[in-house]
Amino acid sequence: MSKRIALFPALLLALLVIVATALTWMNFSQALPRSQWAQAAWSPDIDVIEQMIFHYSLLPRLAISLLVGAGLGLVGVLFQQVLRNPLAEPTTLGVATGAQLGITVTTLWAIPGAMASQFAALAGACVVGLIVFGVAWGKRLSPVTLILAGLVVSLYCGAINQLLVIFHHDQLQSMFLWSTGTLTQTDWGGVERLWPQLLGGVMLTLLLLRPLTLMGLDDGVARNLGLALSLARLAALSLAIVISALLVNAVGIIGFIGLFAPLLAKMLGARRLLPRLMLASLIGALILWLSDQIILWLTRVWMEVSTGSVTALIGAPLLLWLLPRLRSISAPDMKVNDRVAAERQHVLAFALAGGVLLLMAVVVALSFGRDAHGWTWASGALLEDLMPWRWPRIMAALFAGVMLAVAGCIIQRLTGNPMASPEVLGISSGAAFGVVLMLFLVPGNAFGWLLPAGSLGAAVTLLIIMIAAGRGGFSPHRMLLAGMALSTAFTMLLMMLQASGDPRMAQVLTWISGSTYNATDAQVWRTGIVMVILLAITPLCRRWLTILPLGGDTARAVGMALTPTRIALLLLAACLTATATMTIGPLSFVGLMAPHIARMMGFRRTMPHIVISALVGGLLLVFADWCGRMVLFPFQIPAGLLSTFIGVPYFIYLLRKQSR
């Protein structure tokens, strides 16, 4: 059976090699006659422009694609091995976004030179790594704490990047294409800098081979075998962070390869660590090589697109196709080394107090604000004048925060994975892509089509996830991988459209950032009605949400029909996410963090967890919307970005508090 399972991906890999070789041959032949290849490779004639392009552009581009692809496959295995999570990749600990933030700052400051950008990328990645290690150190760098700290710090850096883009859109236009990954080369300098750095990374990885193997076991077993677990994790993750920063500096952010290559290596039968490291590096090099040759062909027949976009568009369908054949997927137990507050009693009193606090926040957001003369408390006629402007956006923020938080609770309980959230399922990105696509297809003012276009995008995404995950027995982790594949593909497509320079993208940039600016009374009423219906259904799923985190075997033992239950919960979470996304755009924080905040406050039983998460999500977004209107008055910051700035410090405080 295992041989038959491994045969299909092996044939697929061979097919990809043949296609990549054929495309390379065709692209090189179009650029230069085959009779001149040898001369152009070794000693190009400076009077023949085709030979110069062949030597200084095409060949270095081929070499850099192989080097970067191999490096991404290598660091993907490192992250997945150390964190024991199949969803871990170079962006998991915030490495890529930290490096990108460093380079964004150097771009704004107009600091010249390749060494300046390389130093900025390394500095950004290392600062993020130090913050993550500092948060998780008190818990002996447990995988769950590292993942959560890395995710929220990554969100924080991403929010800063997005904020800089909103206020410096024209100045950072060139960053859009680079952010999605570009392998364009003008000499051999990039290759000459990168290959010795990668070789050093490979040598250090081989030195860490035994500790890395033991880190794939349970923490207790690894310690009993004599491994200094915290030190080993620190060394392995530091190595992965440095390699990732070097790759980001070289070509920008190329997603998906770090996730896909290790999974395909495992499917090919590479169970032991060393063969998996080697095979994942080869697969990563092959995928990036193929993607870049497709781009060279597209540039000639259509237009230039970014490498990261094509990589995601190739990798996502491949992963969806291969998912049913992936047998063993596991994630770390969310309770490993995870001390949380004692279970809270008197839940009703806490819920009432939270409701009162939320009501007070709404009143303050409605009445307290700034105008041309300074701070003022609006009342009477002034409040009546302000209500049509403030009421819709405050209610939109409240409803969206509640729905995203409840959706996050459902998804995390359904999958048992601490990285699970509405945006990981790809539904938010699918809805956003539907809206942006409609903007490009419909002439004139297309915002009237926002709701149907976004709903269709979310529905198509959900359908693809259900088909891909259902073919393999509807495993929760297959579902997460399918969602992550689609989310990566949609995000890369959105970034590619941003890089196109089309002025219409500026119209939706704030909406994508989670802005309540365009909320209307009619939209808020529709959202409120849908929210009430969906929240009324949620308590009916209480038994399922209580039993599913105990595992599939336990659920079957008590008579639960797993597949229909998982489909029903997925549909509920998808409807909550899509409705919230249509209202204020694809947020990237509340659905992930609100359930964790409620849990760390001591609410772990199903209904208390859901209720407190909903209150936390609503309060967070209402406060974020108010801050977004007031902090830089009269300018505004989207609530989605502000919720990240507000929520991340509190979440990190809770993580640190647990480790004392």
PLM region descriptions:
Residues 2-660:
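Alpha-helical transmembrane segments in inner-membrane proteins
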